[in-house]
Amino acid sequence: MLHVSGWSRLASASKITFPVLALSAALAVPALAAGVKTITAVMHSDLRVIDPGLTTAYITRDHGYMVYDTLLATDSNFKVQPQMADWKVSDDKLTYTFTLRDGLKWHDGAPVTAEDCVASLQRWGKKDGMGQKLMDFVASLEATDAKTITLNLKEPYGLVLESIGKPSSLVPFMMPKRIAETPPDKAIPEQIGSGPFKFVQAEFQPGVKAVYEKNKDYVPRKEPPSWTSGGKVVKVDRVEWITMADAQTAVNALQSGDIDFMENPSFDLLPLLAANKDMKVETLNKLGFQTLGRMNFLYPPFDNVKIRRAAFLAMSQKPVLDALVGNPEYYKVCGAVFVCGTPLATEAGSESLTKGNGMAEAKKELAASGYDGTPVVVMAPGDVVTLKAQPIVAAQLLREAGFKVDVQATDWQTVVGRRASQKPPKEGGWNMFFTNWVGADVMNPVANVSISGKGKNGGWFGWPDDPKMEQMRDAFSRSSSPDEQKKIAADIQKQVFDQVIYIPLGQYFAPSVWRKSLTGVLDGPATPIFWNIDKSE
């Protein structure tokens, strides 16, 4: 779901008193042995949910990478690599055999077994979109001995490895069997993984502070790190995540050395930070985020494809990105449904979005569509920096095209609840909302749940009922040819634009900043990751 990046605008001096007190509380730590090397980080959001199979929230995914490990992982060339296991595929492409590597232990000291991993995959496969699709093709999944997992398919499926090695939410993290058998809609009772860090439950303050210590029993792979693959070598003793919702307080703490790393400073503070010789500013997630508009297909006016097309033609990415980000260094006008910079990227059919030249045609289309003036109810959260601009700019463009628009100011958590409502807009429903996906979550037709055509039968909010889309997604899933997959993906993009399944409004990039006393900070599609980072005094 939403990656809530950025921080609130600068508060007045009278409002900074409480964050300073909160900072003092968060930074208060138990007495540590001399020489304990600690990284203190302010993440993009506070951590409350610590079950990485329960929510797609990116802060929970990031927590997952600290504590847990994966069977497979994706490198910077979009290739799936062995992580906890390597694999073999039968000649008929129906049997995948995974063999666990040596030296794998859970944090409680027990060995990792194939039974643990089977249970973990089964739990993940009930909740994750790619996991559900994979399980539709699975005939059997079993542990054939302590180190061997055998997956048998009903028919060839082209995304077995990509599903198990997916880098972002929901990540198929491995857990002990007793924990993985927790129903997927209930929180797991323990934080026991096999990953490079151990979670310090005793110091966890939900929404305030999370602490991780180096897992001294972890055996890294020999390969160099690349995205979420390769050797996860931990070079510090301890990592602390603390919450500071006030931007200026966090920046002050970074400049004074009270914290070492800030994941997502607001764009207006970047020049100040970049000018500091002790700071390094860099975009770690090179795929960035896709921001998008979503319509409700169940009710007028957007139950009419002609009216949806008029709205699509009225949209323009540049004014949205200018209002959202401001500095073109940190955004990209990009019409690719599967985001620019990925193997499936194409901008075919997106000219009106990327060039902003569709308004005249939008007015003609709307006039010919039978639009009767039904107001477009747009949900506009005002509490999230990366979601404030989109509804305001979109409403202006819709009005220019001839739509009547009702912008309803709210907060993001209300949007999260209200967008699940299938009631009419007059009864608390909605017509349009906006959100952001990290690039890794939308870079292929199976991962990208926004293009689902399942309607009310398991589709994403907005509920387009599009059997043709589902047929094409299944065809993509069955294909193992990159060329064929690329052609199918291009056809899917055409269908997205023809039916206006959703409206891509561009790509933006959220830089991180850290003190130069940190070295070895890695990039990737699911950042930040804290292995490989060292800290000097």
Q: What function would you assign to each model-found segment?
A:
Residues 34, 99, 133-205:
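Surface-exposed binding/hinge segments that line
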Residues 42-92, 119-122, 192:
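N-terminal lobe/hinge region of extracytoplasmic solute-binding protein
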Residues 51, 298, 302-342, 389-390, ...:
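Periplasmic-binding protein-like
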Residues 92, 107, 152-171, 192-246, ...:
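Aromatic-rich, solvent-exposed beta-strand/loop patch
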Residues 197, 329-368, 382-389:
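Structural transition elements
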Residues 204, 512-537:
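Long beta-strand-rich cores associated with HINT superfamily self-processing modules
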Residues 206-208, 246-247, 265-267, 331, ...:
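Ligand/substrate-recognition segments at binding pockets and active sites
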Residues 355, 406-417, 445-516, 537:
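Extracytoplasmic/peripheral linker and loop segments enriched in polar/acidic and small residues
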